[in-house]
Amino acid sequence: MVVTRSARPQARNEATSVESLRQKNSAVTRLHVHPKGRKGSSPDNPNTTESQTTPERSPAPKTRKSGTTGSLPEMNKPATDGEISEAESDCSSVPEVQDPVFRVTRRRQILVAGTPVSSVRKRLKITRVSESHTEEVVSEADSHVSGISRIMPPTEITTRRSKAKSQREPKQESHVEVISDAESSCSDISFSGIATRRTTRSMQRKLQAQTEENNTKIVLENEKEIIHTPVNLEDSVNRRTSRLLARSLSQINKPNFSNNEIYNDPDDSFFGISGKKLAVKKTRNFTIREEKQDSISPLKEITKQNCKSLDEEAKKIIDGGKEGNEKNSQLNLSEFQDTGLQQLVSQRHSTPESDKTTSESSTLNHEAVMKSLAQTFAVVEMDRWNEERKNAIKTSDCSEPGDGSYSDSDEECTVIGVSEDMSKEKEVDSESDTKPSNLEFNTTQDKDDSVLLVLSSDESQQSEHSENEEDTVCFVENNGNKESLNGDSENLSHDNALFVIDTTPGLSADKNFYLDEEDKAGEVATEEEEEEEEEESEEELSDHDRNKDNEFSDEDNLLSNTKSKLLKLMSSSIDTGLNIKELGGLYINFNADKVQLNKRTLTQMKEKRKDELLQKTVITPEFEKNYCVPPYSESKYKLQKKRRQERQKTAGDGWFGMKAPELTDELKNDLKALKMRASMDPKRFYKKNDRDGFPKYFQIGTIVDNPADFYHSRVPKKQRKRTIVEELLADSEFRRYNRRKYSEIMAEKAANAAGKKFRKKKKFRN
């Protein structure tokens, strides 16, 4: 049930009816009967014990002024739907109710519950989402049952930090009531019944200044009521001693809040039978051991002094608590509904007295812890990483023999707390109560060196310490991975470069690429030896180091391996058929001092440069034979003459620059045969050649066989000759025709000669 602000004026008006109803109830007698009836049960199920101790550990929910006074008359009203819905919720969550008590001051009336061992938490009434506004008005006993019973919704989880924030001193509880109802009610339904609160540094300073005054006022105002109120002595003594232990533990455990968590199995919480003995013992052992492990170096001196006294007090209190816890389990829901109001009143009177007894010891412990932390934090910050592993083994021996049976559950609890804190780190980061509490959180999570969390804070000094701490964390982590990184340094040296000129493709810059067979065999052997050394070094690493390497260097190894493989596959190691040694080696050289150019290439380049220079010089190789030194510049006339001679060498652009060949005897005979072509081949007609001499520009070409021509109609390649005259002489038809013509010509000449002779004779005769 939630009391809103609008219901508070109505609560003030109905305050008188509360007093009348309180007098009419016969709960005073039941107040004495109730603790006795509780003593008859036996601690059978450890899960119910955990659930019953949870209300004791959490101090009472406190609302703003008269926030509960309005809820008292409403709880006394008869309810129909509200009781049924609360009964259903109680049946589903197995409510386990502790002795509730009202603490009455001048202005407000507060619901309080005892805290034997564990963390302190503010609890408000539970809001049912499915219920309507009219169902919120339920009876007083139902509200106590629903407010104190541990309800575990599966969706909400309270982190270790939120639990640690609620581990406040009882003297601070009265001033934390200023927190709004909505904020506290939203955080009411939680895993272990602990509500998170957010306090600033100014709020803490005000609280520390005001708590001492208010505690004395509360005690002075309520001394008379405490004297006249009937209180069960055994119950009050147990409550005081349990609170004394809880506060002394919470003062030391306050900086080390990350592991102060009691794991409650949800399955066991639903089917729990009462068993407080197991839970109290487990809680004590767990908190003592965890505070020893967590405050290793900063709280080393304090814990040595306080752990012994805490162990003695815990044994005494638990021995006395066992007797009371065995008798406190069997109660019906109806008895709680009848006796709830008076029990709240009795607890309310007992709490100021317990506050008075424990205020001095808690303040002394708190001041001692804060002073020692302020003095030793700067000195011990660098040393606590080295001392952490050594002390973790020693502190495990400090726990009692009863820890052995619950070691598995404690380890499970630690794992769950770490995972929850990692997920909720950013949300509850601003809720830190003290500076050492955030800084010690790193030591508890960094035991295994697998999860490294450096918390940030709003305080400037704490941020500086956290930066230093982050450096130390990285230093420790690098020491762990030093061996694995040394093995991969050779591969990563050339893979990390963005732009690499591939001097020796596919390999590192130190290795040779073009190797002989012997060199290759030697290099393969060296690579195998290096791989074996790396494997041996990896085998020497422990399982813990391998886990760290897998977490931090799997991706780097993947990238480096793929890069090296791609380089080997895509490198220019293909045989190109060129001998680079003969060509003078690679054309890119990184070492400028070791440049060795080939001598042949140098001489060739020098000769070319000399020829180019000598062409323009006057001094030529035959300079000695000249009679005079040639002029450096020629006249225009001589230049024109040279150009004319150059032009005469070719037939011009019209003949495509045909050059004039040199006339030889063979060329002259060919030209004569071409002139006589008409007489040599009478069957064809040739144009008459009027030229007397030989042509200046001509070319003699070759006949290209036409594939369309008949084979015998063309001259085969074997029968072809070098000149035209030789081909004519080799032709039989030409020769036969040439003989016949030759004889005819010779006969004519002879006839002509005889006729002239005959004519001459005749001439003389006449």
Curated annotation (Swiss-Prot):
Disordered, as annotated region: 1-99, 155-175, 345-367, 390-450, 520-557
Subcellular localization, as worded in the UniProt entry: Nucleus; Nucleus, Nucleolus
Signal sequence extent: none
Segments forming a coiled coil: 515-552
PTM sites of type Phosphothreonine: T127, T229, T620
GO CC annotation terms, alphabetical: chromosome; nucleolus; nucleoplasm; small-subunit processome
Residues with PTM Phosphoserine: S139, S143, S146, S180, S190, S236, S248, S250, S258, S334
Annotated segments matching region TdBR region: 558-615
GO BP, one annotated term: RNA processing
Role this protein plays: Regulates the transcriptional activity of DNTT and ESR1. May function as a chromatin remodeling protein. Part of the small subunit (SSU) processome, first precursor of the small eukaryotic ribosomal subunit. During the assembly of the SSU processome in the nucleolus, many ribosome biogenesis factors, an RNA chaperone and ribosomal proteins associate with the nascent pre-rRNA and work in concert to generate RNA folding, modifications, rearrangements and cleavage as well as targeted degradation of pre-ribosomal RNA by the RNA exosome.
Binding partners and assembly: Forms a ternary complex with DNTT and core histone; interaction with PCNA releases DNTT and H2A/H2B histones from this ternary complex. Interacts with ESR1, ESR2, PPARG and RXRA. Part of the small subunit (SSU) processome, composed of more than 70 proteins and the RNA chaperone small nucleolar RNA (snoRNA) U3.
Protein name per the record: Deoxynucleotidyltransferase terminal-interacting protein 2
